[in-house]
Amino acid sequence: MLTQFSRTELLLGKEAMDKLKNSRVAVFGIGGVGGYVCEALVRSGVGAFDLIDDDKVCLTNLNRQIIATRKTVGKYKVDVMKERMLEINPDVNVRIHKCFFLPENADEFPFDEYDYVVDAVDTVTAKIELVMKSQAMNVPIISSMGAGNKLDASAFKVADIDKTQMCPLAKVMRRELKKRHVKKLKVVYSEEKPTRPIEDMAISCRNHCICPPGAEHKCTERRDIPGSVAFVPSVVGLIIAGEVVKDLCAK
């Protein structure tokens, strides 16, 4: 029978589509990367999701995040993403968590229900804990390395964390995971040398914050605010989604 997923089924086959429909993917971080992960996975037929993020859509997100429009500024990202996913597939099951993943609340998430975990968060502390928790529960995980301050979308590739180079975030992750005796982690990273952002206080969030009312204003507390473009984090998200689909279908 012809369905909205028929074109995908022509490539993957019915057995693979059934696997996707019966899978639950947890996406941690619904931003420039995570938003496109969700977009591609729901369009691919994944049947259930957990979305984790405590941020609200900010005006500065409009340059790259698929959930960001003038109408969604000020709304929780997980709410906007869920609404969008239901418009694509009314039968999708989406659970939202309006919080930031930390070691302190890691046990509150049902990792035993996840078939795959996507790490699209920004902080090293959260990323490390997410990797440790996922691997302890034998849940496959893929982690996004640095997408900020990059301009060459074609430079991103899939590799084990031990094979990465150039990426500053991957370097820190390698060191921290080695301390914890973690030997393998699938990541998406780039060997492009990061571009140094222009130091212009007139366009600095630190001095001219335009976060919506009620937001956490985290940007004003960050030591460095990376530059970003529409065509880089989106590609990272789509690469990650492709890996998730292939791995779920191969189970």
Predicted features and spans:
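Glycine-rich phosphate-binding loop and adjoining beta1-alpha1-beta2 segment
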Residues: 46, 51-89
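Hydrophobic/small residue at the entry helix of a nucleotide-binding pocket
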Residues: 33-34
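Short, well-ordered coil/turn residues at beta-beta hairpins
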Residues: 120-121, 144
